[in-house]
Amino acid sequence: MASELQRPKTPLPLFSDYHTHPQGHRVQRYTQALLQPWADSARRVGLKDIAFTDHDRYHAGIEFDEIDQLRERNQDLRIRAGIELDNDPIHSAAGRKWIEQHWDKLDFVLGSVHFLDRADQMFDSVPEGAAQFDGRDIDAMYADYFRRIRELVETGLVDCLAHLDLIKIHGHRPNADIASLIGETLEIVRRRNIAIELSTAGWRKPINELYPSDPIIELAIGKGIPLTTASDAHSHVQLGENFARLARKISAFGVRHVCIFQKHKRAELPLQV
């Protein structure tokens, strides 16, 4: 358990946010006017390394030249070009093709599952998505969700998984023991040598919990799965949100390193001043 792990005497500082959405939830072309506030906010909260990971359905807005210009203007920061690939039944095929075509320009690809039965609505939409769970077999929904996660991992296109237990967002819990389901999923993650994120976004959602939950974090640590830190910011003011709280959580688990990415190559950096 976390209490049995070695604990640093003080919470460790966090320096990277690897889940951000400058475009929000619509196509917006990358410009300096759009991106510079993110660099300013990163600097203000003490971040040194950030990854832009807009949803793949908005890839038309991503301009690598603009990211390069931003890097030139903010050389004290490490700014990564990334994207979040999900299982959007309408757009993800085009998103995967775009990622393959621009693989060498990307530093980082997040993978996530936002869609279950409905092609026209993400199940994690708040509050509308909660209706997708009404009258449903929650155990079956959890099994379906993690099956889709495993399928995404097996594409070989993702460097890290986002909000691994997003299925809990509206507060629905499985009745069945899902330890084997989680274990199977994490074993594929380990075999594929990818990371998972610790996301503070869950603390501002109805579930009011970190993504993923403590038991999943423990299993991941036990399997040696690398970790990133993330806010899932959809506004630059959310960068690094609740990272002080996340630092305390990480400290309790005895985690001493988090990973960063450059051109899909992972490096683990110590959580030290």
Segment roles from a protein language model:
Residues E218-V273:
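Long, positively charged, glycine-interspersed low-complexity recognition regions
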Residues P13-S16, G24-V27, T31, H91-D139, ...:
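N-proximal accessory regions
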Residues H25, G61, V113-K223:
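Domain-core and long-helix interface of multi-subunit machines
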Residues M1-P89, A93-Q101, C160, K168-S180, ...:
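An N-terminally biased module of ancient metal coordination in phosphate/nucleic-acid-related enzymes
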Residues H19, A42, V109, H163, ...:
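Conserved, mostly hydrophobic/aromatic
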Residues L47, L106, L157-V158, I225, ...:
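A structural motif
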